[in-house]
């Protein structure tokens, strides 16, 4: 399969996704900081280094760009509750987006349960506590309508930062896999801050790669400018992102990975990301993957079914 054939099968932010909340989700990434260090975190919250916080003016610009979006506007991290101006972020979101479309992706309220209750629709939020009973209890106490999960089941995270281009030489085979990517077909686009500027990506993993690599002066700025029409762009307008980030990604491999909270788990990374993949917890094991077979490819039916995958 070639690039153009793959792009025709891929889903831009403007197209409704089957099974997604309200037919679609666009995340606003507010910080990479997190109180957890889950194995294989898609947003690199298991890594050390700088963890920026989105400024309020850029956050409001991001929110305004999505006023006419049909789906959920998600607040995303990291753990968004660690943003020092979390309550101000919530006020901005309330100002521009109706309750039905306001979603939160958060593992621990960190004392913000009351403002979360006022701000977010629990039916379109994702509150995975990653086996943390204190976080679960705080959600239920301060936001009784919320639906936290992950108290009794861990999540299996497939290795995202094993770049396909490092383990699959055949570009046409990579495009074939990219055209079937679970994140593109089922998850979300993302707005975030790259080198101090607001940018948008058709995929949350593309955005994460950019944020993690942004301190490399030679790393390209692939994000699109954020205005009220950015999310309406056709997939062809995101082709430069796909050419860069999809081949630098491991999602389509559906590798077996590790349980998010498994203390004996092994992080996996390939050469493309090895320099920036410096773990927040240096005591953890890390494997430099060089062969496709090392990730136990296609062990999982779907990358995004992380709770169900914990049973495999």
Regions found by a protein language model. Give the residues of each.
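Short, charged low-complexity linear segments at domain edges
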Residues: 3-23, 144, 149-163, 207-232
